[in-house]
Amino acid sequence: MMKVAADDTELIKVELIEPQAALYNVAAPYNLTIGAQGSGKSHNIGIGSGFFVEYCPNVIGIIAANTYDQLSRATLKETFGTWKEIFGWTEYNAKANPGGFFVIDKEPPAHFKNHGHTFKSNNNNIYFANGAVVFVASLENYTVIEGVEVGWGMLDETADTREEALTSVITGRLRQKGLCAAKEPIDGIFPYCPSDHPAAGKPVNPLFVFTKPA
């Protein structure tokens, strides 16, 4: 069990099975989780990406899946549900949900913290109220990822992904500076931190791969 500080006043208990919890025991550049359908892989993407957004908002992340259908209908659907359940984050809407924490494919509202980046387009970008940015992508069209730099990545259902997409494109994009292994887990739960954090250790750009058995 992990306790997540969703804000300054509330602690939320998160139940993780052992393979899920193992991802947060140590900071590592490559992290592989193999599980059958329904084993909680996408749920763990929601938890892990939420931690990076919460603790390392200045570092851009990427969430990708093998196909666009997989990305939109499963990976992101589960991720958004996990963000709401664990962190209390929902999509911002000026009229329907003015207290929302993120926007998708659109310019963030003025009250969101400035993320400090210049992007040609807002397509496939998720912007958060604390200034964090996460790209989303389909690995069936992996060449569109070329040219971007990210600090961490989470890939879902990669069993059928072309090897070049992983070895040449994704790993080559993991080079944004600003993310380090934490000498001591932040809040006792998260082994990564910004490079300017007092607990910052060696620089790292972690890649998390979640896939089914071959």
Locations of the language-model features?
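Phosphate/NTP-binding elements of NTP-utilizing enzymes
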Residues: 1-214
